[in-house]
Each structure stands twice: as C-alpha cells, then as structure tokens.
A protein has these predicted regions:
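Short, contiguous alpha-helical
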Residues: 18-64, 112-142
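Short, helix-capping/interhelical loops that line the mouth of catalytic, cofactor-
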Residues: 43-89, 104
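Conserved, structured core segments of small domains
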Residues: 18, 69-72, 94-101, 108-110, ...
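Globin-like tetrapyrrole-binding proteins
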Residues: 1, 9-13, 21, 67-68, ...
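A non-catalytic, amphipathic alpha-helix used as a structural packing/dimerization or gating element
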Residues: 89-96, 131, 135
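Short amphipathic alpha-helical segments and their helix-coil junctions
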Residues: 5-16, 34, 38
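Charged/polar positions within long, soluble alpha-helices
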Residues: 99, 103-106, 138-142
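Onset of an N-terminal alpha helix
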Residues: 1-7, 26, 130
Length: 142
C-alpha cells in the first residue's frame, strides 16, 4: 500500500464531501475503513457467515486482484457505520492505522480469517486493504 498516496487523497476530503454513490457520510466512510483495518490488525474478529464459508474462497481473488470493487457491494455487518462520527477524529484514526501498516504491521497480520474470503496472506491483505481504501476514496471523488 502506498501510504503517501492514500493520505494525500484523504487530505482532499472535507467534512462536507458528498458521495458519488451510496449513503455513507464521509465521517462514516472513514470510520468504516478503520473498522475494516481492525480485522487484519487483530483488534476485531467478525465471525464467518455461511455464504462466506461456502463461496468465499472462490470469490477471494476479487479482494486482491487489479479490478475495482463494484459500487454498492455488500459489506461485513460488524463494520457498517450508521451513527454520527467526528470527521477529524475518524480521519486521524485511519491515518494512524495506515501508518501502522506502512511500518511493517503486515508481517503481524492476524491469522483470523476475513469474514467472507477466509484465510489471506499478508500480501493479499495488503492489496485488499489498498483496494478497499481506493474504492471508498473514489466514492468521495478523490
């Protein structure tokens, strides 16, 4: 993941940024991305659902390949953010998590499986994290 590129794009966001698709406010999107980062960091352990257990391994490449994620894709239920959040607090938290990844946390990724795709390597997690951030930054036009 290129932390500089991501944080420069995040710096283009404001608390008034409007999504090009979806219903999340920008502060909710930042909190959602942070909640997603908590999974590979080992701070959250969402359970695997039946659908993920059945087809997750077959769909796994969509998480880390070069194709963009589709708009309005369903998400992990435990990282849906629907309450009000403080823009600057959420932005700072996400920037801290990005810095943790950039400083070698990928070697310490949790062995807990992704709740849909299952077990991922550190490289797959890294690509998927970037892809997820890129998806949501594009959602807000940056």
């Amino acid at each position: 993941m290129n932390a500089v590129e991501i944080t420069e794009r995040m710096d283009q966001l404001s608390e008034n940024s409007i999504p090009e698709w979806g219903t999340m406010q920008v502060s909710q999107m930042l909190a959602h991305c942070s909640a997603f980062h908590d999974i590979p960091l080992g701070n959250a352990f969402p359970p695997r659902g039946l659908l993920g257990r059945l087809i997750g391994r077959f769909a796994k490449p969509m998480f880390y390949n070069d194709k963009p994620l589709p708009h309005n894709m369903s998400t992990i239920p435990t990282i849906i953010i629907d309450d009000q959040r403080q823009f600057m607090a959420e932005k700072e938290k996400l920037e801290q998590q990005i810095n943790i990844f950039q400083q070698g946390a990928s070697e310490k990724f949790s062995r807990h499986p992704h709740p849909f795709f299952g077990k991922l390597t550190a490289e797959q997690w890294g690509k998927g994290i970037y892809k997820h951030l890129d998806h949501h930054l594009k959602q807000f036009g940056v």
